[in-house]
C-alpha cells in the first residue's frame, strides 16, 4: 500500500495546483451477460489565485477515474478576478435545478459554504465568502452552477469600460 501511494504521488505534476475530489460514484451498466461496474469521479483543481477548473473522469478503477478527472480539470480552467480574497460583488449561478447565491464577505468571515462549493472556494484561494445553494444538491450541478456564477462576475474596471464611465463613477 505504501509503495502504491508513493508511486501515485510521484506521478502528480508539481505545478502548485490544489486538487480536491468532490465525488466518486460507482456506476453500473446492465448488459445481456450481466452488470458491468465502473466508477465516475468529479474533481476541482485551482491555483489558489483565482484560477479554477472542473473535470469528470470515468473508468473501471477508482484511481484511473480520479486521474482522468484531475487532468480534465487542469485543461478546462477559467480565471476569476478576486478582490482581497473575496468576490467582486454578489453573484448568482444556475445549472439544471441547482441555484447558488455567492456574497462577498469582509475579512475574518471565512468560507461559509456547503458541500462542493466549499471545495471550489478553497482551491480557488477565496478566504472570505458567504454562499447558499438552493434546489438540487447533486454535486455535479452544484459545481457547474458555482462555476457559472463565478464566470459571470465582472471587475469594476470591466463594468466601467462597458458603460463608458470611470471606475470612480461605478464605485460611487
Curated annotation (Swiss-Prot):
Pfam families to which the protein is assigned, alphabetical: Ribosomal_S5 (PF00333), Ribosomal_S5_C (PF03719)
Keywords: Ribonucleoprotein, Ribosomal protein, RNA-binding, rRNA-binding
Classification via InterPro entries: Ribosomal_Su5_D2-typ_SF, Ribosomal_uS5, Ribosomal_uS5_bac-type, Ribosomal_uS5_C, Ribosomal_uS5_N, Ribosomal_uS5_N_CS, Ribsml_uS5_D2-typ_fold_subgr
One cellular component term from this protein's GO annotations in UniProt: small ribosomal subunit
Residue ranges constituting the S5 DRBM domain according to the UniProt record: 17-80
GO biological process: translation
UniProt-recorded Gene Ontology molecular function terms: rRNA binding; structural constituent of ribosome
Transmembrane annotation, as ranges: none
Similarity field: Belongs to the universal ribosomal protein uS5 family.
Its job: With S4 and S12 plays an important role in translational accuracy.
Subunit structure as annotated in this protein's UniProt entry: Part of the 30S ribosomal subunit. Contacts proteins S4 and S8.
Protein name as catalogued: Small ribosomal subunit protein uS5
Amino acid at each position: 500500500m505504501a509503495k502504491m501511494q508513493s508511486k501515485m504521488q510521484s506521478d502528480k505534476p508539481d505545478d502548485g495546483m490544489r486538487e480536491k475530489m468532490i465525488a466518486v460514484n460507482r456506476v453500473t451498466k446492465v448488459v445481456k451477460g450481466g452488470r458491468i461496474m465502473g466508477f465516475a469521479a468529479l474533481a476541482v483543481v485551482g491555483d489558489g489565485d483565482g484560477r479554477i477548473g472542473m473535470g469528470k473522469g470515468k473508468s473501471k478503477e477508482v484511481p484511473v477515474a480520479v486521474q482522468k478527472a484531475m487532468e480534465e480539470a487542469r485543461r478546462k480552467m477559467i480565471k476569476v478576478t478576486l478582490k482581497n480574497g473575496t468576490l467582486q460583488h454578489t453573484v448568482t449561478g444556475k445549472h439544471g435545478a441547482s441555484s447558488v447565491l455567492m456574497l462577498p464577505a469582509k475579512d475574518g468571515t471565512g468560507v461559509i459554504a456547503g458541500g462542493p462549493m466549499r471545495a471550489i472556494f478553497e482551491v480557488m484561494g477565496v478566504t472570505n465568502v458567504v454562499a447558499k445553494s438552493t434546489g438540487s444538491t447533486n454535486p455535479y450541478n452544484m459545481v457547474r452552477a458555482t462555476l457559472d456564477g463565478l464566470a459571470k462576475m465582472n471587475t469594476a474596471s470591466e463594468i466601467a469600460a462597458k458603460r463608458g464611465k470611470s471606475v470612480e463613477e461605478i464605485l460611487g
